[in-house]
Swiss-Prot record:
It holds the Pfam family Flg_bb_rod. PROSITE patterns: FLAGELLA_BB_ROD. Belongs to the flagella basal body rod proteins family. InterPro entries: Flag_bb_rod_N (IPR001444), Flagellar_basal_body_rod_CS (IPR019776), Flg_bb/hook_C_dom (IPR010930), FlgE/F/G-like (IPR037925). This is Flagellar hook-basal body complex protein FlhO. The gene is flhO. Transmembrane segments: none annotated.
Length: 270
């Protein structure tokens, strides 16, 4: 009896995690460059049931009577790195990173992904956000974190009257302030989310620069913002499915609770 209780409980926990993932995706639907998390349900290994043959002298002969599933769990979440829609804003601090060509991993059949490197207190992190701003030192930043140039230095401009070419060269008042660096993750499985807008590498190593890589073609578009790739309609539909599944397993647990209560309080009186 308890096996069924454990199975229903694991399903509730899995659906709760799924709901949290979908809620976070929906909450960031309007966040520039946000990449939707995705996850899939997996079953725990099945347990093989058998019984001991009572006629066997040694009592060691067994007959298989079937198997039982021991529950489900939600696999580790991973972002979906497909490019979001592009929106023209005419704001000089909106700079979209457009992936024209990136290599495909032969092992995972997934495309590589390009990122802006930013400097944080914990080291270099990587962002897909296209919304830039200037800090008090007139450095180009993403959410207050300086964007690094190909020389691994922050890029300082005189004011918001600067231009960015398609290869990332920043010009302000007639001088070149630097070239915005772009890094490439060949295997996106090596990335882990660090907050909603940053990523880091699982092994702690820096991503290689995409500049000069003949397998990569990209362009930077000033005055253009990349939107999130969250499909809000699909997310709400999945949210409804998760709620219904959660409630169904909740009812199963309530039924088990009533059965165990009857076994403990009524059958025990006989």
């Amino acid at each position: 009896m308890l096996k069924g209780l454990y199975t229903a409980t694991s399903a509730m926990i899995a659906q709760q995690r799924r709901t949290e993932m979908l809620s976070n995706n929906i909450a960031n639907a309007n966040t520039s460059g946000y990449k939707a998390d995705q996850g899939s349900m997996r079953a725990f290994p099945e347990m093989l049931l058998s019984r001991i043959e009572s006629k066997s002298p040694a009592g060691t002969s067994r007959t298989e009577i079937g198997s039982v599933n021991t529950g489900v769990y939600m696999q580790e979440l991973k972002p979906l790195f497909t490019q979001g829609s592009l929106k023209s804003t005419d704001q000089p601090t909106d700079i979209a990173l457009i992936e024209n060509q990136v290599p495909m991993s032969a092992e995972t059949n997934e495309k590589a992904a390009l990122f802006y490197p930013v400097q944080t207190a914990d080291g270099i992190r990587y962002s897909k956000s296209s919304t830039f701003s200037l800090n008090e030192n007139n450095q180009l930043t993403i959410n207050g974190r300086p964007i690094l140039s190909t020389d691994r230095q922050p890029i300082t401009v005189d004011n918001e009257n600067f231009t960015v070419s398609e290869n990332g060269t920043v010009t302000t008042n007639g001088r070149t302030a630097g070239q915005i660096d772009v890094r490439m993750a060949e295997d996106v499985r090596n990335l882990k989310r660090d907050g909603n807008d940053l990523y880091s590498t699982a092994d702690g190593n820096d991503l290689p620069s995409a500049a000069g890589n003949n397998q990569v073609a990209y362009s930077l578009k000033q005055g253009v913002s990349e939107l999130s790739n969250v499909d809000v309609t699909s997310a709400y539909t999945e949210m409804t499915e998760a709620y219904r599944s959660f409630e169904a397993n909740q009812k199963v647990i309530q039924a088990y609770d009533k059965s165990m209560d009857k076994a403990a309080n009524e059958i025990g009186k006989i």
